[in-house]
């Protein structure tokens, strides 16, 4: 109901010369299509709901898992810090999102957190718009469908050592860029336009988070074993066991802003 009201308010205050956000963009798209071809209002509300839902719990979960993997994969943390951020960006400023291509190992690290521990094992419910057949199975129109992302992202035929955290798998042979072909196999990118957009935003946020935190700070584990730290807690989105002992240290003396 909250999102429905917000979307309708956008419609009432819509100005084609002042596109404020994605909701306005959806209304503009609707208004520019011929009568009969435009998306119904309900579909726009559902699209906004998908984007809102995909960016709410999953972003915080992704941030939490990425921080946990910085702790449990110290060699990856060190490589992000020393081989990329210190070298490509320097210590005098923060990196920009437009510079992500200069930090391929960091981006590969983010990609690796998705299949290793799939934050959302099953997608939210989808519905078929027509009768269809998939791999010999008949799926009728308006059938509720859940996609098992966990299975796809841990399929041995698609992934080498799917349960092993290995950042390098997403890099090209010369380690200078992301392997586009392999990265597109990550199921999280293939569950619909709205979710794809939201997941792309999630990846930007995690990238920004790591680029802000790791240049100046190093994260280290406390007393638990590595196995205990990454033990998952199952739910609609999968979280890790709470880490009771956690250390964050300055990498070097920071200059005063005064």
UniProtKB/Swiss-Prot annotation:
Cofactor (UniProt): heme
Upregulation: By 3-methylcholanthrene (3MC) and estradiol-17-beta.
Pfam families (alphabetical): p450
Keyword annotations from UniProtKB, A to Z: Endoplasmic reticulum, Heme, Iron, Membrane, Metal-binding, Microsome, Monooxygenase, Oxidoreductase
Localization in the cell: Endoplasmic reticulum membrane; Microsome membrane
Enzyme Commission designation: 1.14.14.1
GO cellular component, one term: endoplasmic reticulum membrane
Example GO molecular function: iron ion binding
Highest taxon in the source lineage: Eukaryota
Membrane topology category: Peripheral membrane protein
Catalytic reaction list: an organic molecule + reduced [NADPH--hemoprotein reductase] + O2 = an alcohol + oxidized [NADPH--hemoprotein reductase] + H2O + H(+)
Homology family: Belongs to the cytochrome P450 family.
Function recorded in the entry: Cytochromes P450 are a group of heme-thiolate monooxygenases. In liver microsomes, this enzyme is involved in an NADPH-dependent electron transport pathway. It oxidizes a variety of structurally unrelated compounds, including steroids, fatty acids, and xenobiotics.
Protein name in UniProt: Cytochrome P450 1A2
Lineage: Eukaryota, Metazoa, Chordata, Craniata, Vertebrata
Designated gene of the protein: CYP1A2
């Amino acid at each position: 109901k909250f999102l429905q009201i917000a979307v309708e308010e956008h419609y009432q205050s819509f100005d084609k010369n002042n596109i404020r956000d994605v909701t306005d963009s959806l209304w503009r798209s609707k208004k520019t299509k011929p009568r009969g071809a435009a998306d119904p209002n309900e579909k726009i509300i559902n699209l906004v709901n998908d984007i809102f839902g995909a960016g709410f719990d999953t972003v915080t979960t992704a941030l939490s898992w990425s921080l946990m993997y910085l702790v449990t994969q110290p060699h990856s943390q060190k490589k992000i810090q020393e081989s990329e951020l210190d070298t490509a960006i320097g210590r005098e400023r923060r990196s920009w999102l437009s510079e992500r291509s200069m930090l391929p190992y960091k981006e590969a690290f983010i990609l690796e957190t998705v299949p290793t521990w799939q934050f959302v094992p099953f997608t939210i419910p989808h519905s078929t718009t027509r009768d269809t057949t998939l791999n010999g199975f008949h799926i009728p129109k308006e059938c509720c469908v859940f996609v098992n992302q966990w299975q796809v992202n841990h399929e041995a035929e698609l992934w080498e050592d799917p349960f092993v955290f290995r950042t390098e798998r997403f890099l090209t042979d010369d380690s200078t860029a992301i392997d586009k072909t392999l990265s597109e196999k990550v199921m999280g990118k293939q569950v619909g336009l709205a979710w794809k957009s939201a997941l792309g935003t999630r990846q930007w946020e995690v990238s920004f988070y790591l680029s802000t935190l790791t240049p100046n700070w190093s994260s280290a584990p406390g007393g638990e074993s590595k196995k205990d730290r990454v033990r998952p807690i199952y739910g609609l989105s999968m979280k890790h066991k709470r880490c009771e002992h956690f250390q964050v240290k300055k990498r070097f003396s920071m200059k005063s802003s005064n």
